[in-house]
């Protein structure tokens, strides 16, 4: 299902009709949300998903301004039939990402943990960008989850580098030592660290609102089990 995000999350009559068909219930359903070019990041994705529990996945796409310029099929065909508009395919565009997903050729990046290794993750992202390799989905654990989350949000090396620089400097402050607590499960309470993570991401964003499909892994210390967040 393809929808413009600006139209609101209400379930349409067509969706209700399809939901009543027995054959439709056996088909994998995915949501593609279209966002205007220049949108900083999606918002309110959770509202769309709550109204459609039958969805298997969702994808966010930025659409070029020209897609909203032409309202008739004839004008769209005329634009694409013009040789001047037939340039090389941009493999980094959101529509190329969708095409790879539909063809089972998505490129995923998973970043590991290790504290200071986060700086190395930044260097690897730079190398991937310089090599012209698109990143379609991301995941990670510990510092890798932080770095992959930033990339899924911004998808821009300069912006991610700036956010990382601020966070690295934040974590080097001596005020970190004020976060000491009784060492039952940890030497630090985690409040200072959690606050620094929240500063790096917009307050109103959820995992569902990230541009790229994202997951991260944590450990539930109460049950010693793995938790996957996506």
Where are the regions that the model predicts?
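Conserved catalytic-core segment of NTP-binding enzymes
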Residues: 1-61
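A structural signal for isolated positions on well-ordered beta-strands in alpha/beta enzyme cores
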Residues: 30-32, 108, 215-217
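Generic detection of short hydrophobic beta-strand segments and adjacent strand-loop junctions
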Residues: 61-63, 229
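Extreme N-terminal, non-catalytic leader segments
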Residues: 64-105
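Patatin-like phospholipase
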Residues: 108-110, 117-200, 228-230
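Phosphate/pyrophosphate-binding loops at sites that engage ATP/ADP/AMP, CoA/4′-phosphopantetheine
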Residues: 200-207
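Active-site gating loop/helix substructures
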Residues: 208-230
């Amino acid at each position: 299902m393809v929808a413009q995000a600006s139209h609101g999350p209400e379930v349409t009559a067509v969706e209700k009709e399809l939901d009543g068909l027995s054959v439709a219930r056996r088909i994998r359903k995915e949501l593609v949300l279209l966002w205007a070019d220049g949108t900083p990041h999606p918002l309110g994705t959770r509202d769309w998903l709550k109204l459609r529990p039958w969805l298997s996945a969702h994808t966010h796409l930025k659409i070029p301004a020209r897609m909203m310029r032409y309202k008739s099929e004839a004008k769209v065909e005329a634009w694409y039939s013009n040789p001047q508009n037939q340039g090389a395919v941009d493999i980094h565009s959101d529509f190329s990402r969708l095409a790879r997903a539909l063809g089972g050729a998505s490129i995923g990046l998973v970043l590991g943990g290790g504290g200071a290794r986060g700086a190395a993750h930044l260097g690897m992202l730079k190398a991937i960008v310089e090599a012209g390799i698109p990143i379609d989905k991301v995941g990670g654990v510990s510092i890798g989850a932080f770095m992959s989350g930033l990339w899924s949000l911004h998808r821009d090396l300069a912006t991610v580098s700036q956010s990382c620089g601020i966070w690295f400097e934040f974590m080097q402050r001596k005020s970190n030592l004020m976060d000491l607590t009784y060492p039952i499960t940890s030497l630090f309470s985690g409040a200072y660290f959690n606050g620094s993570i929240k500063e790096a991401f917009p307050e109103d964003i959820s995992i569902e609102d990230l541009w790229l499909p994202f997951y991260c892994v944590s450990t539930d210390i109460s049950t010693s089990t793995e938790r996957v967040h996506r």
